[in-house]
Amino acid sequence: MKYWQAILFFLFGIAFANNLNIPWKACPNYKTYSGRRHYPATGPLRLPFQRPATSCRTFHSKSVEQTIEDVKEQLEDEDLARLFENCMPNTLDTTIRWHAADSHNPQTLVITGDIPAEWIRDSANQLLPYLPLAKSDSPLATLILGAIQTQAEMLIQFPYCNAFQPPKQSFLSGNDNGQSDRVTPAYDPAVVFECKYELDSLASFLKLSYTYWLYTKDQSIFTVKWLAAVERIIQVLEEQSSPSFDEKTGLPKDPVYTFLRNTDSGTETLGLAGRGFPLNANASLIRSAFRPSDDACVLQYFIPANAMMVVELSHLNQMLQASGHADIARTALVWANKIQKGIDQHGIVDHPKFGKVYAYEVDGYGSILFMDDANVPSLLSLPYLGFVERDDPVYVNTRKMILSSEGNPYYLKGKVISGIGGPHIGLRNVWPMSLIVQALTSDDDDEIMSLLDVLKHSTAGLGLMHESVDVSSFKSFTRPWFSWANSLFAELILDLLERKPHLLKKNAS
């Protein structure tokens, strides 16, 4: 970037802040703010109003504000209305760390919440509830397009990394993650916050891109930069479909990606000198070193991420065909079909109690990991991802397995909450995210209403979704500012108003 361009970016950032009338030094740290009750409180649970002051919000959207008012007017339950009012705008209110609204090259940095870095997966999911509004809200569309283009820049540089620092042109300082990771390919810590290779991160970029294009039909998404990011993703699929051993010599192959961290936690690093445990040839699946929880995979053919990639490669084929990029479109479809074949052959397995189910992880040798984790993509989320229908027989069996402590070691039960957790936090904590996904993938009215009741109480009176909560006490929780979970809750309410309005609407028959 030339000196004069840097000056323009700097001045634009100041202008953007001034346009929002943000007195930056006067705004409280939302990590602290979200952990305290603010008034007015409303509803039977007296849930507080947790949005920051208007002048402290990081982005304003008239269409989002109107949606909040429209939904509040429709909802019978005052507690759900307050939760939606807090959760729906949380990403816009608190996590738009930087936005350059250049009509030719918009850029947007979306942090996770209390961690001041952008995760590709989290940021994509944080923006999803706003996409249906983008066509009629030009500033919102520009914000989302900017997020897509910023993600593209990140992935072009370091496609194996999951979390990123503010872009150089934002003039924002980065943060040290406190680790001394040894990773190949090497990365630049000025650009990358963490470099865990997670297949679902790549799928999340494709999902955000497709969903934006689906709602807006905006052809400006197809930039040289965006197409280069897609080609980098295809390159990673090629590299990570390779087995651990050379099929001719039988010797171990040099892995493209390795990760080692000095840690006491087995879920934070990879075995065998950072390569992870062996994968067999001819599995037609893609390796993932880490899960969406940022925990290491045990068996690196991680089925939920492969399923998500099938869906998003099919979507990619659709949008590329429509935009005249037939060659890349065909490549995407070939990969989608190949991975689907691998899931059919290796991902559907026989469980001694639950019958034919989807495995969580496999290695192509016959090893199977039966479990599920709260983070999306998960086995529970397969219908939400668009991979199967809710009544798919294998999914129905899988759902019974993973919503049972007999079939899923991370299905946790306690005095106040039962649901799926995971190794990331430990064996006492359920993630509200898993209850939201359970409701999104359910057709049972009683089950959905029961889940909503638990979700209302899970906030410990703070009116926001938390990362995880102790099974015995809602007052013990992690991460009061976890924007992805707030966006997912908003998605659930919007979904139920459309799919099952009789459960939520006033005077519904």
From Swiss-Prot:
Membrane topology summary: Multi-pass membrane protein
GO-annotated biological processes: carbohydrate metabolic process; meiotic cell cycle
Keyword Transmembrane helix on entry: yes
Compartments (UniProt record): Endoplasmic reticulum membrane
Pfam families in the record: Glyco_hydro_125
Domain of life: Eukaryota
UniProt keyword list: Endoplasmic reticulum, Meiosis, Membrane, Transmembrane, Transmembrane helix
Main location, first listed in the record: endoplasmic reticulum
Transmembrane segments: 4-24, 140-160, 296-316, 368-388, 417-437
GO cellular component: endoplasmic reticulum; endoplasmic reticulum membrane
GO molecular function, one term: alpha-mannosidase activity
InterPro entries, sorted: 6-hairpin_glycosidase_sf, 6hp_glycosidase-like_sf, GH125
Record PANTHER family: MEIOTICALLY UP-REGULATED GENE 157 PROTEIN (PTHR31047:SF0)
Function in brief: Has a role in meiosis.
Name of the protein this chain belongs to: Meiotically up-regulated gene 157 protein
Gene source species: Schizosaccharomyces pombe (strain 972 / ATCC 24843)
Gene name of the encoded protein: mug157
